[in-house]
Amino acid sequence: MAGARLLQEGRVSIVSFTLGASVISLPLLTSSFTEQTLLAAAPGRIALVFFIAALNGLLLLLYKAQLYQVAIRASFLGFAFGCGLLLSITQSPWKPFGWYVCSLSFFHYSEYLVTAMNNPRSLSIDSFLLNHSLEYTLAALSSWVEFTIETTIYPDLKQITWLSVIGLIMVLFGEVLRKCAMLTAGSNFNHIVQNEKSDSHTLVTSGVYSWFRHPSYVGWFYWSIGTQVLLCNPLCLVGYTLASWRFFSERIEEEEFSLIHFFGENYLEYKKKVPTGLPFIKGVKMEP
């Protein structure tokens, strides 16, 4: 029964994300709005408010309790994804921000969906990673503030299309690598570092794990940096790079203590052959 409930949550998330993303159809359904006026003009914003209210009402009718909590989060991410798409096809200086919103919303939604597919026993509302940490939230807010200020005082900085494209490629690479890592690890993957070995816990060394010891962290690292390259945010690019490097350095060391405890010599041999994948991060240092 638990498995069926969790699988249902995955299906609910797909439906809800799609409903939220359907906001992109508003300019197609009426000649009153274009992509630009829907997001920028007052009538368009009013239409978005009505869309959100109608969507929330529909979700309240369809789902109760825990399923509604899943649905409202997935639909919010879908709505953000749809608005990001609308923004990305405009000719405004905010076009790169549209790409960014699509990347951010899809990252959080796909974290939940892949967990539902891969490791339903660990699935929870927290699998969306929307409440990852205070530091994560502040980092996101900082990038939005920097983009807004620089767009206002120096809009040409945000018109370096080739740089934004490089950032988008980094984001896509990081996203694909992380999800490949999650799918390859299967039920071994968990958003929380495990300190106790479960009966089903095995050492995964195939697929992307034959390239890097920590491919999910490598993906997240380059995804994070790529978002700031995409936005042409020079200040946050430096900050994100340093903060991400420090976070993953500490996280990998913590995780590898557990992995050595779980798998002993097998992990030590694997560690000798395969790099972490992150620059200047070696993992746990073992005494000779």
Curated annotation (Swiss-Prot):
The keyword Ion transport does not apply. The gene is icmt. Substrate binds at R251. The chain crosses the membrane at residues 13-29, 46-63, 74-91, 97-116, 136-153, 159-178, 217-232, 234-248. One of its GO terms (biological process) is methylation. Residues 30-45, 92-96, 154-158, 233 are lumenal. It comes from Xenopus laevis. Keywords: Endoplasmic reticulum, Membrane, Methyltransferase, S-adenosyl-L-methionine, Transferase, Transmembrane, Transmembrane helix. This is Protein-S-isoprenylcysteine O-methyltransferase.
